Amino acid sequence: MALGHYEIKKAKNGQYHFNLKASNGEIILSSEMYASKASAENGIASVQSNSPQESQYELKHNTKNEPYFVLKAKNHQVIGVSESYSSPTAAKNGIASVMKNGLSTVIKDLTL
């Protein structure tokens, strides 16, 4: 089965961020903003390293009590955030998708 890919983008404010997309094109993880493209690339490397490890995920609820999850690096810093899901089961399926697709080495640079 095909893995997803990462997309690096430049925001209007000049900062960089990335999304991890599943093979169906759906965004399954989004990063914070980074001051440089190199920092965003380091963030991708951290997702690639940490995404296979279930212990690096934390299931949370937003203000509407909708479940979502964060992926944390070994230093406990958040390196990616999911969308909101309809149920904890759906969020856990999202974690499983990031665990699989996070290993992708395909990075599409949309800043060029």
UniProtKB/Swiss-Prot annotation:
The keyword Repeat applies. Keywords: Repeat. Gene3D superfamilies: 2.30.29.80. The keyword Translocase does not apply. Sequence repeats lie at residues 11-59, 62-110. It comes from the Bacteria. InterPro entries: DUF1508, UPF0339_domain, YegP-like_sf. Pfam families: DUF1508. Belongs to the UPF0339 family. Duplicated subfamily. This is UPF0339 protein YegP. The lineage of its organism: Bacteria, Pseudomonadati, Pseudomonadota, Gammaproteobacteria, Enterobacterales.
